[in-house]
Structures are given as structure tokens and as C-alpha cells.
């Protein structure tokens, strides 16, 4: 992932100004800062959920300006348990992700790897917070995305 001189504004307020960074495959980067300083805004801008004012973003040499399926398939953005639907099962969540990302992942293998087979058919509403976090990780694995963005992964 490569970000060069990223600027993001809300109205007349600049939230991110001229941010540049680069992350190589396999590298883990953390942003530690007080609430309200732009961490979520950064993830939203990279994901194309909000517009950027200036700057260049590329994921695995795929340009942000395309923001098509190829760009978005490289990225998986998790915001705590906001990505989960209470009345679906973990298995249904993974099947949806696999279809949306056109992934070749083996859902049964993912459940085995994460020791989730016993609760793959329970509704999300009936799962503990720890189990829900396992479901989020499983969703990422099912996507085949190469970049994982975690917003407040230890929240809750």
C-alpha cells in the first residue's frame, strides 16, 4: 500500500493533511492516537467510503482512482462488530464474503483452522464478543484480500 500526500476534509475542516506512508506485503502498521484525530477517516478514505481532497493511493499497484472491483478486492476493512448481522450465522457471513470477493477460499477449512466449526451455524446474536471477533477474522480469510484494515480491533 502506498499513500502520498493524502489530504481529507470534512466541509472546511482539514482532518488529514499531506499524509504519506508505505506498507510492504506482510508488514504490520499501527496508528496510535487519541480519539478524533483521523484514524477512522484515514481508513474510510483508503476504502473509498469518503472522498479525498488530494493525494495518491495505490494498493498493490492498483490506483485508487479506479476504485473498481480490482481495487476493492485487495482491501478488507473491519470496524469492530459493525460488519456483522445479528440474525445471520458465521457460515452465512463467510458465504457472502466469498461471493462478494469472488474468492476461492475453503470456508470449511477456515472454520477448522480457527476452531469455529461448533458455532458456525449459530446466529451472531448468540455469540460472545470473542466468538464475534473470530467471525471477523474468518471473514477476512474468506475474502482473499491482501490488505486488512482494523479499526479499533480491541474495542469492547
Predicted feature residues:
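The feature captures the beta-strand-to-loop junction immediately N-terminal to the Walker
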Residues: 32-34
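Conserved ABC transporter NBD signature motif
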Residues: 52-66, 70-71
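Q-loop/switch helix immediately C-terminal to the Walker
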Residues: 81, 86-102
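Conserved ABC ATPase "signature" region
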Residues: 95, 99, 105-120
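Catalytic Walker B motif of ABC-type/P-loop ATPase nucleotide-binding domains
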Residues: 148-152
